[in-house]
UniProtKB/Swiss-Prot annotation:
The active site is at 164. It comes from Trifolium subterraneum (Subterranean clover). Its EC number is 2.3.1.74. InterPro entries: Chalcone/stilbene_synt_C (IPR012328), Chalcone/stilbene_synt_N (IPR001099), Chalcone/stilbene_synthase_AS (IPR018088), Polyketide_synthase_type-III (IPR011141), Thiolase-like (IPR016039). GO terms for molecular function: naringenin-chalcone synthase activity. It catalyses: (E)-4-coumaroyl-CoA + 3 malonyl-CoA + 3 H(+) = 2',4,4',6'-tetrahydroxychalcone + 3 CO2 + 4 CoA. It holds the Pfam family Chal_sti_synt_C. SUPFAM superfamilies: Thiolase-like. GO terms for biological process: flavonoid biosynthetic process; polyketide biosynthetic process. This is Chalcone synthase 2. Pathway: Secondary metabolite biosynthesis; flavonoid biosynthesis. Belongs to the thiolase-like superfamily. Chalcone/stilbene synthases family. PANTHER family: CHALCONE SYNTHASE 7, HYDROXYMETHYLGLUTARYL-COA SYNTHASE. The primary product of this enzyme is 4,2',4',6'-tetrahydroxychalcone (also termed naringenin-chalcone or chalcone) which can under specific conditions spontaneously isomerize into naringenin. The gene is CHS2. The lineage of its organism: Eukaryota, Viridiplantae, Streptophyta, Embryophyta, Tracheophyta.
Length: 389
């Protein structure tokens, strides 16, 4: 008779969870940050709020964002005036948009990832879907399964309303699934659409205005599995270690609340300070076992919540400016796409590493770190090992 321990041993993969493909997608509507304040105050009938518009213009100018992509076009907003008002009851209109658009955008990214992977989609065993918006039943995971034509017995995991740290969460979950289920191939999808947070400006809620200056729409997808099939599957990054922690004394630092008016966004001023104060401890825990204490010797993928967070982390750790190059590039081109951001940065880094003739997918370096920051204040840490190009 076979023992339980023998069964468990047979169920486990031998090697680490490996990212085997990456795909990204954005809505067609590209928004230029320089002209966005004019559009935003016009479409929300707020042009009379001159001082507030000037404040918003300064926020946009300081954001280090050149462009963003948004599902909400001028036409859609004109058809849904309640979405443009500050705190007007509008959840029905928002839900009608996102329950369709979130899985659809996710499908676009997933199709690209599956194409790069090069294997039949029938080999996908697990699906992790993550989004901040559009809670529905059956969920976006079910809708994506139908849209892609995945097998009905794919094992699904749906993560709603986790926020900006969740790009790290999906990697942590995918790692555990891949390493504990021999032969598993996990499709990971983060799809974020800001239709649930868009609203007009208010003098009394400036944190909402910060969100209007930063957030953009995007979806990213990965294929994750252990023990890549030689000659067929091409590893991009290996996931070696993961952690999640709640930063001490950070309650209320970043909050979101689902209301009749959509998802509201609340932010304390010292979020960059809280992140930078706690990042050293997270790095020591992650890299001490590897005997790494020089954080300029590793590659960096940090959720770009905003330029102030990146600036303070760089300052605290005395990081060279090029360490955050891929992160800042994604912030500049796409804005803050919540959970999808770090996956976009992974894609940016491996592509630029190849284009620049570097030796590894991690900017020529062997080890790297990926950070997610979000509500809680929650910090996700993933230790990555690059692959030779």
């Amino acid at each position: 008779m076979v023992s339980v321990s023998e069964i468990r041993k047979a169920q486990r993969a031998e090697g680490p969870a490996t990212i085997l493909a990456i795909g990204t997608a954005n809505p067609a509507n590209r928004v230029e940050q320089a002209t966005y304040p004019d559009f935003y105050f016009k479409i929300t009938n707020s042009e009379h709020k001159v001082e507030l518009k000037e404040k918003f213009q300064r926020m946009c100018d300081k954001s280090m964002i050149k462009s963003r992509y948004m599902y909400l076009t001028e036409e859609i907003l004109k058809e849904n005036p309640s979405v443009c008002e500050y705190m007007a009851p509008s959840l029905d209109a928002r839900q009608d948009m996102v329950v369709v658009e979130v899985p659809r955008l996710g499908k676009e990214a997933a199709v690209k990832a599956i194409k790069e992977w090069g294997q039949p989609k029938s080999k996908i065993t697990h699906l992790i879907f993550c989004t901040t918006s559009g809670v529905d039943m059956p969920g976006a995971d079910y809708q994506l399964t139908k849209l892609l034509g995945l097998r009905p017995y794919v094992k699904r995991y749906m993560m709603y309303q986790q926020g900006c740290f969740a790009g790290g969460t999906v990697l942590r979950l995918a790692k555990d699934l891949a390493e504990n289920n021999k032969g598993a191939r996990v499709l990971v999808v983060c799809s974020e659409v800001t239709a649930v947070t868009f609203r007009g400006p208010s003098d009394t809620h400036l944190d909402s205005l910060v969100g209007q200056a930063l957030f953009g729409d995007g979806a990213a997808a990965l294929i994750v599995g252990s023990d890549p099939v030689p000659e067929i599957e091409k590893p991009i990054f290996e996931m070696v270690w993961t952690a999640q922690t709640i930063a001490p004394d950070s309650e209320g630092a970043i909050d979101g609340h689902l209301r009749e008016a959509g998802l509201t966004f609340h932010l304390l001023k010292d979020v960059p300070g809280i992140v930078s104060k706690n990042i050293d401890k997270a790095l020591v825990e992650a890299f001490q076992p590897l005997n790494i204490s020089d954080y300029n010797s590793i590659f960096w993928i940090a959720h770009p919540g905003g330029p102030a967070i990146l600036d303070q982390v760089e300052q605290k750790l005395a990081l060279k400016p090029e360490k955050m190059k891929a992160t800042r590039e994604v912030l500049s081109e796409y804005g803050n796409m919540s959970s999808a951001c770090v996956l976009f940065i992974l894609d940016e880094m491996r592509k630029k590493s190849a284009q620049n003739g570097l030796k590894t997918t991690g900017e020529g370096l062997e080890w790297g770190v990926l950070f997610g920051f979000g509500p809680g204040l929650t910090i996700e840490t993933v230790v990555l090992h690059s692959v030779a190009i």
